[in-house]
Amino acid sequence: MLRVGVLVSGGGTNLQAIIDAVKSGDITNASIEVVISNKKDAYALTRAKENGIAAESVCIKDFESREKFNDALIEKIDSYNLDLIVLAGFLVVLPPELIAKY
């Protein structure tokens, strides 16, 4: 079973489609472990919680530099021991370290 993390920025319509596909069996051998947003108020986080999925936010405004934000994002993702990251409307340029890792 693949442990999947979904990165989002907004309402989460793409996330909902993925959740629905997992529930219906259209996507097999995968479990959404966490939804991470760069916005604390993203409705996608509500969608995650309503479906029993961990919901986290890592907001760039909470950090004094982009490098510290990148480090925090990678640390948050790593804490879930994920096999795969899905970008579902994540409106942040990914740090090269994250791309190399996943």
What are the functions of these language-model segments?
Residues 1-102:
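One-carbon transfer enzymes
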